[in-house]
Amino acid sequence: MIYLPLLLAEEIEGGLFDFNGTLPLMALQFLILMLLLNTIFYKPVTKILDERDEYIRTTLTTASSMLVKADELAAKYEEDLSKARRDAQAKIAASQKDAQSIVSEDIKKAQMNAEKLITEASKQLNIQKEEALKTLEDQVDTLSDQIKTKLLSSQSLK
């Protein structure tokens, strides 16, 4: 029976949670473990994660600025290209207009030369016609005089 109160006392002392020297030792071990984990593991990991976040942030910023620059350059090149096309079309139109005016001028000159040649040919033909008519008139006069003399001489012979 004497033994029973000791057993009851041990049961009461050895319960689920005792407030003796092991509790502060466990708390101290826990704090030392947390301190070691913080210095050995968490700080380098958070530093690496922070560096990675910073790298991603700067890379995204750089990429977005490069994308904006690329868009600006593309817009500028499109504008320059459309301006060059307009200039080229204007030059082509001006060249076509100049060529058309040169062709029209050449056609007018050719027509004027042709008209001049036709006029000169017509004048020459009229002159030749006049000369031919004059020659024919002279020949007709001569022939009629000859016929007349022959007729008169043949009548005088009869």
UniProtKB/Swiss-Prot annotation:
GO MF entry, a single one: ATP binding
Major site of localization recorded for this protein: plastid
Localization per Swiss-Prot or TrEMBL: Plastid, Chloroplast thylakoid membrane
Claim: Iron-sulfur is one of the keywords in the record: no
Thylakoid keyword on record: yes
Pfam families: ATP-synt_B
GO CC, alphabetical: chloroplast thylakoid membrane; proton-transporting ATP synthase complex
Transmembrane segments: 21-41
Alphabetically ordered keywords of this record: ATP synthesis, ATP-binding, CF(0), Chloroplast, Hydrogen ion transport, Ion transport, Membrane, Nucleotide-binding, Plastid, Thylakoid, Transmembrane, Transmembrane helix, Transport
InterPro entries: ATP_synth_b, ATP_synth_b/b'su_bac/chlpt, ATP_synthase_B_chain
Membrane topology: Single-pass membrane protein
Protein purpose: F(1)F(0) ATP synthase produces ATP from ADP in the presence of a proton or sodium gradient. F-type ATPases consist of two structural domains, F(1) containing the extramembraneous catalytic core and F(0) containing the membrane proton channel, linked together by a central stalk and a peripheral stalk. During catalysis, ATP synthesis in the catalytic domain of F(1) is coupled via a rotary mechanism of the central stalk subunits to proton translocation. Component of the F(0) channel, it forms part of the peripheral stalk, linking F(1) to F(0). The b'-subunit is a diverged and duplicated form of b found in plants and photosynthetic bacteria.
Listed HAMAP family: ATP_synth_b_bprime (MF_01398), ATP_synth_bprime (MF_01399)
Other remarks on this protein: In plastids the F-type ATPase is also known as CF(1)CF(0).
Family (UniProt): Belongs to the ATPase B chain family.
Subunit comment: F-type ATPases have 2 components, F(1) - the catalytic core - and F(0) - the membrane proton channel. F(1) has five subunits: alpha(3), beta(3), gamma(1), delta(1), epsilon(1). F(0) has four main subunits: a(1), b(1), b'(1) and c(10-14). The alpha and beta chains form an alternating ring which encloses part of the gamma chain. F(1) is attached to F(0) by a central stalk formed by the gamma and epsilon chains, while a peripheral stalk is formed by the delta, b and b' chains.
The name this protein goes by in its record: ATP synthase subunit b', chloroplastic
